[in-house]
Structure formats: structure tokens, C-alpha cells
Amino acid sequence: MAFSSCCWILLALTWCTSAYGPDQRAQKKGDIILGGLFPIHFGVAAKDQNLESRPESVECIRYNFRGFRWLQAMIFAIEEINSSPALLPNMTLGYRIFDTCNTVSKALEATLSFVAQNKIDSLNLDEFCNCSEHIPSTIAVVGATGSGISTAVANLLGLFYIPQVSYASSSRLLSNKNQFKSFLRTIPNDEHQATAMADIIEYFRWNWVGTIAADDDYGRPGIEKFREEAEERDICIDFSELISQYSDEEEIQQVVEVIQNSTAKVIVVFSSGPDLEPLIKEIVRRNITGKIWLASEAWASSSLIAMPEYFHVVGGTIGFALKAGQIPGFREFLQKVHPSKSVHNGFAKEFWEETFNCHLQEGAKGPLTTDTFLRGHEEGGGRISNSSTAFRPLCTGDENISSVETPYMDYTHLRISYNVYLAVYSIAHALQDIYTCIPGRGLFTNGSCADIKKVEAWQVLKHLRHLNFTSNMGEQVTFDEYGDLAGNYSIINWHLSPEDGSIVFKEVGYYNVYAKKGERLFINEEKILWSGFSREVPFSNCSRDCLAGTRKGIIEGEPTCCFECVECPDGEYSDETDASACDKCPDDFWSNENHTSCIAKEIEFLSWTEPFGIALTLFAVLGIFLTAFVLGVFIKFRNTPIVKATNRELSYLLLFSLLCCFSSSLFFIGEPQDWTCRLRQPAFGISFVLCISCILVKTNRVLLVFEAKIPTSFHRKWWGLNLQFLLVFLCTFMQIVICAIWLYTAPPSSYRNHELEDEIIFITCHEGSLMALGFLIGYTCLLAAICFFFAFKSRKLPENFNEAKFITFSMLIFFIVWISFIPAYASTYGKFVSAVEVIAILAASFGLLACIFFNKVYIILFKPSRNTIEEVRCSTAAHAFKVAARATLRRSNVSRQRSSSLGGSTGSTPSSSISSKSNSEDPFPQPERQKKQQPLALTQHVPQPQAPSTPQPQPQLQQQPRCKQKVIFGSGTVTFSLSFDEPQKSATAHRNSTHQNSLEAQKNNDALTRHQALLPLQCGEADAELTAQETGLQGSVGGDHHPEMEDPEEMSPALVMSNSRSFVISGGGSTVTENMLHS
């Protein structure tokens, strides 16, 4: 009796611990009991517990048809397993299912019932008492729904290692096996769902959203994960609010105010339906429309929110739903529900009343029978429903479940129901593994197996962790190390049904968590219906899109998603909208006008085909042609006096160097290459130095010839042709050394300059060393300066040697060109640098060619009469007379000044005719003064040998060459006449040479002694002040020569005058002339 009493006491405690009556549970006996937790109601009624009496369990309100369907799915799966011969044969599964009322407190009440029963069962009281009402232990629990509820349940069940398989709790916190040791689930965790939400926002190019989350273990972790994903994608969150079904009205209104004032059109919601319902109701009351709701799977298909009267607010919602499954026979099972037939389901009675809005007779504590049901109907009566305060009519019992549209019968997309079905089968397959376990291959110590008849919860948990089976849909079911079951999501869009006006969930895409990143999301935009029945994707950005060619610019104090569009700078581009930065174009490209792409830069250099390049090329070719023409003329007329007088060999070399100068300019035209860059400056420098070296040697040689007396063998030896070429080579060799050092140490190279202009690449030559270029040009200018000095010094030599004057002009042109070149070279860039240097080379080359050779070519071709030996001698004699006359004029002025100081008087010299004969006694006879001033004539006759006294016939002499030169001195003009006796050239030269030597002996220190042998009228007393500069002997060889003369030394004034047969000087009316003659 004692044990019997104890048994009844424990059973009573167990019964009381549950705090549930028969109508608040679904229960069926079996060999193995499975527990179930389902939200048959959405919440509990608020009650003030003032503790004036014994507290009672709160009442559940607002019936949940979908929760009842989920419960039906568990019962259907258990009955299907019990009827299956292949799965757990000879064993029966029972169940104990409780209503959580979507609250933690109710769920914990049910969980305590499971735990207490297991503890009582562990005492093995059956051995001591006959307990017919003994209930086996609950070896596993299916549930709960919300993550917050499952968290509380898991903490309690985990203490006793009772496996919990949830069908709808997706919080990622539940994957923590250190805290939730016995928790498993047949739904993916929210980590994938949050990532999928961020992918959708990125897909539609939204970046300005708001977030709302339930203030529980489902909403907070889910929205936190979403924030992390949004930050990685540069998605900004305008507001973030927490809600709860227990929030007061003021809190709800504050959240609604935030939503109403926000510019974000997209709102991401991590919440369950019950928690979100109060907020949606307030939004509907305020008629806030135009928002796009992005729903998590917990409310994406919630019947609380998906109501037709809310559609103008929530229409167009994009939500995530679990992959729909198929449960064969489940539809028929749902249709068979009836209070009289569902004897083990205490929730069927309330379901029937809520479905048909009627009430059933309150009966006994147990399930209603048909008689009781009918008797209650006959007796009538009424009661207040726990979900309504209105009186309802009695139910007839003949109502047709198919005639009423409720969420219970919405079996088209079985998602949560299928997860419940899968959870039950997972536990069944774990029990099957225990049932079929072979000793030695088990999961326990030493491969042992559990006893299926005495199986414990922890043993089932062990087999669940190693579960692997194939579902009825052919999918492999296995839990990972975190107890999660991987799965995919369907993307649904809320539409309004045209048939009955209800909200339907149309599948518009899917999210595959197993695919590669970037390939997981698929959306069919054509199927989406947005808020307001629009097909256009709504705009939910803080700023308008920045078009291609612009970038996003940060606004101070604003989130990164709020920006201004800034045009890309030149040289950068963006080819996409909302570019965060502009990409820099490659070096050889530049941005187009709109900065949307890069186009190839224009390549610019001094091209052969452009007008400027063509013009320079034509001028260079013209210079080459003219130089070649001059060279041809000089070769053809190489034996004429004018060619010989210019030193034929040096002239040929000079013309060759000018050819090189003109040719070197062509290296500056065309696209610069490394080899052209290394060749053009040395070619130009060496060519010009060779040219100027030739001019320098020629000018210096002529100057020395004209300053010398009658040329000696010394002059001929040291100023021979070999020495001239040696000097030219030495001068040129210095330039070659400079170029060689330059090319070895810092060789020039082609260079693509991107910095001068943005849209143009200038291909130029990088000189390598500006110092080397300075040395090259500086050395050239140094030689040119020396050449200019000698040319200027010999500018007054005889007219036929007047190339010194033209060389002076050419050197002036050379200096002007290159002095102008320096600032022009420094101030230009790109192709104009080469153009400036080409112009300088051509200008200098044309100056040298024109000044030195054009006059000679003109005489050779068009004035052949001047290209004779007589012309050369005539101009040379005139030059000698000029020198003597200047000396005489200077001395006459000095004598006049002396006479004036002594009181003497001077009169005009009368005109006279003087004849001078050469003899040894009186080489300079004094002329007789005449009384009357007449034109004067000075005649020199060469002494003739004595002839016999008897007259003899004289042979007719050949007419001798004769020339006249007018010389102007002050106010007077002197006409100089000169004739030559060619047959007596040698004798005359010998005689005059002897006479010259006698004069030199007397006037060795006089500056005019070089001309005294030629001018018998010249005074023997020299002016000590006369210098070489005063004689005007600064110039180059420019006169005509006798064909037999090979050297300019033969054209010196002394030799020319000594070769003359006679000369006559006449003039009149000039004191200067008279003084010159009488002196």
C-alpha cells in the first residue's frame, strides 16, 4: 500500500507539474515518447499578478491555425512511422505535445513536464508498485518555433542531454554547442539568411535601408549579422529599431515616427509575425505606404501580417521562405480532422470552434465522444471563447473543413510543416540505428550498442549527431558539427490574388547557399510586383546614382552612402554607375570628353608627313642640292683663278662638311628612335666643326699671306696643304672626342613624354646630358668666334679676296642663329624642340653656303671676265696703292702741322707730269714743279736696253693687258692704271725683287716697306705709327689668279706689283693727291 500510495503521489506531482488539463495537450501512449512544442496560440492574455491568491497559469489567446497544422504534421509523421514495417518494427511511438502560446513561460512549463517525467521514470518505481498510468520518458523533443523560446528550452533540456530538434528556430546563436549541447534543427541558421538579404539589396543597387528586429534571440543576432554583411557591401542603415509584441503603444509610435520620417524605402525586418503585428497595425492606421519590406523567414508567410486589409502597406514584400517539401497524404490527413475523431488531440476542439466560429459543449475532462458532442448541442448553452468575447452559436458537427479558407488548409507550400515532418523522421532514424545496431560496431564504449527497450535520451542524442539518411524527397539528411541542417531559401513576393482578394506568396527566385559567391542569388524581376502594383524597381538610395564619368564624393558629416557626384578629373575615367573612385587611364591613354572611357593619346613628333616637317625636309634637300651644285661647279672650273685662289682642296672639304650639315638636319625629322637620338647631335656637331675648321684655316692662311712680304720657302713649307688638313683634323678631332665621351657616359635615347600635355604623347629625344650638349655647341661657337676674328681682321684685303668679308657676314649669321637658338630651345617643348634645332642648322648652313660660295659661283658662271689673272693683279695693285696712299696722307698731315708751327706757308702743288726711270743712282727722282696746275700723271717705265744709233725696223709688240682702278682719298679721286708684260715676267720679277731688297735694307722697321718695292713714288721715310691694322690687311683670299699659280702666296702685293711692266697714276685738283705725289 505504501508503494502504491507513493506511486500515486508521484504521478500526481507529475500531473500537477504540467499545469495543463486534458484540453491543453495532445497525448498518445507508445513504447517511446516524443515531446512536441508548438505555438497553437500567438500569445497570452496580460494579467496583473498581485499575488492576493494562488497564481494561475496565464490564458493563451489568438488562435494560430498554422501552429495547429504544424502539430498535425508531427502526429501525421508519427502515425506514418508506426504503420511502416520498415522503420522501427514491433515498436510504437507515442507523443506528448504542448502549446507554447509563443511565449517562453509556457514553453518552460511544458519542458519542465518533460524533465520531471524523465526523472520519475529514472527511479524505476514500476518494480515496487503497479502503476497503470505510468508514462515513459520523453527521449526527444520536437520544437520549439521561435528562436527565443528554443533558447530557453535548449538551456533546460541541455542539462539532461535530452535531444531537441527544432523545425523553425534559425538564430545563429543556437549553433553554439558549448551552450546548447543537445540542440539540433532542420532549418538553416540565420547567418545564410542575413547574407542573402544583403545580396538582394546589393542586387537591386539599394544602399539606404532601415532595419527592424525583434528584441529577442532571433531578431538581435539576425540583424547584427545583416549589419556586418551590409557594411562589407557599402550599404548604409538609416535607422535600426527593436520591437516586441509586448511593447507599449508609445514605443510603437516612436518606431513608426522614425519609419515615417526616414528617406529609406527599404526596411529589413528580422522578427516573427506576432512581434511585428503591433507595428504593422500602427503603420496601417497612419497609412504609411511606398515602403518595401524585406522579410525574414519567420514572418515572410505569416498569416498575422499577410492580411488583405494590410496589403496597401505590405504589398510587394520580398521575403525568404524555406524550401517547400512534399508530404504525401498530408492533405487528406488535414481534411479528416474532427473533434470526435481526434481523440488524442486536445487542441482539435478549439480548432473546430475557431474555424467555424462556434462553440462545443463543455464536456468531461477527457476527449469528447460523439454522444457527448450531440448531447452538448441539444442542451445548448454557451461560453466565452478564449480568443473572443462574443457569444458563439453551437457547432452542429456537420461543418465541412474544406469550405473554409484558413491558413490551416494552405498546404500548397509546406515549409515549416515539412521541417516538422523531417524532425520526426530524424529522431525515428536515430532510433532505427539503435534498433539495428550490431554489438562491436556501436557508437558507445567498445563499440557497444544501446538497448532500444531501455533507450535513454542521451543515447538518442549521440545517434542524432551521426545521423545520415535519405528523405522521402531524395535529399540527404545529416547534421553538421553545429547541429544545423544546411538548406536553401526560396524568395517570395506578396501578391494580391485576383480570385478571392487574399495575399498569395509567389516564388520569384531562390538562394543557393552551396553555390559560389556571386552565383547564389537568382531573381526573376519580371515576376516581382512592387508596392503600389508597380513593376519598376523602387529607389532606395541616399543619393542619386552617379553616372559613368563621375565618382561618389563624400559629404562631410553624412554616411558614406550619402554622397555627391564628382566628375572624374582629366586622365581618369569611370565606366560604371556609382563608382567609388575613378580609374586612372594607362600611360598611353587619356580620358574622353565624358570621362567614361580612355582613348589612345595622340602621338606627336616632327613627322615627315606634316606640313612643317615637309617644309623643313624640302629646305634640307634644297640645301643639299645647292651644295652639290656648287661642288660640281668648283670641280668643273677647278683650274680657274678664282677656284685656285680659294684653295681647292679646302673648298672641297668645306662643301662636303656643308653637305653633312644639311643632311644632319634630317635626323631631327621623323619618329625619334634610340639610334637617331644618338646620331643626330654628334652628326650636327662634327659637321659644323669640320666646316668652321676649314673656314678658319683658309682665313688665317690668306691673312698671313697678305701680311707677309714676298713669300718665302718658310711660308710655303709651314702653310702647305698637309699642314692645313692636319689643323682641320685636329680641330674636328676634339669634337669627336666630346661626342664619344657623351655617347659612352650618358647616351641620348628616345623618350615618351606624358607630362607636357595631357592628351598628347610627345616622342622626343632625351639628350642624356645637357652638359655634354653644351660642350658640343660651346666648342663649335668657340671655333666660330676665332674664325670671325680672323675674318674681321682681313676684311679689307683686295676685292678678289673679299671672301673674308663674306665669312664675317656668315659668322655673324652663325652667331645670331645660335644665340637665338638658346632661348628658343629652352622655351619650346615637344616636336618644336626638334624643329627649332633643324631651323638653326639650316639657317647656319645656308648662311655659310651663300656668303662664301654664291658670289664665286656667280663670277664663274655669269662674269667670266673677272675670272682672269689680270683682274687678280689689278685688284691687288690697287690694294697696295691704297696702303701707300694712307701712309702718305698721314705723313703729309704731320708735315703741314709742323710747317704751320714754324710760320711757313704751303701752297698747292702744281700739276705736273713726271716720268720716272729706274736706275741705280736715283731710284726716286724728284719731280719738277710746273707753274700751271694740270692733271697729274705718274708713269713708271721699265728700263730698256740701249739700241744702235742706226734706225732699224721695230717688230710690232703684242698689246699688253691693262686695268684701271679709281681710288678716292678725301675730296680727290685718283685713277690707277696698270699694265703687265707677260714675256718679261721673270726678268721684271727678278729686277723688282732686287730693288725691293735694297729698299728693305734701308727701311727695315717701317710698316710700309712691303710696298716700297712696288711704288717708286712712295717716300722712303715711313710713319712709325702705321700698324698692321691700319693697312687694312684683314680678310681672306678672294681674288682671281693666273691659271699657272697654285698658291695664294703668288698673289701677294709685292709679287703682283713687281710683275707689272708700267703703271700710271693721274688725278687733279686735290691737295691730297698732290701731297701724295710730291712726297
UniProtKB/Swiss-Prot annotation:
GO cellular component: plasma membrane
Chain intervals for the UniProt region annotation (C-terminus): 855-1079
Positions of Ca(2+) binding: 81, 84, 87-88, 100, 145, 170, 188, 190, 231, 234, 297, 489, 557
UniProt region (Disordered), positions on chain: 892-963
Membrane disposition: Multi-pass membrane protein
Interaction with RNF19A as annotated region, ranges: 880-900
Organism: Sus scrofa
Protein name per Swiss-Prot or TrEMBL: Extracellular calcium-sensing receptor
Region (Intracellular loop 3 (ICL3)): 790-805
Lineage: superkingdom: Eukaryota
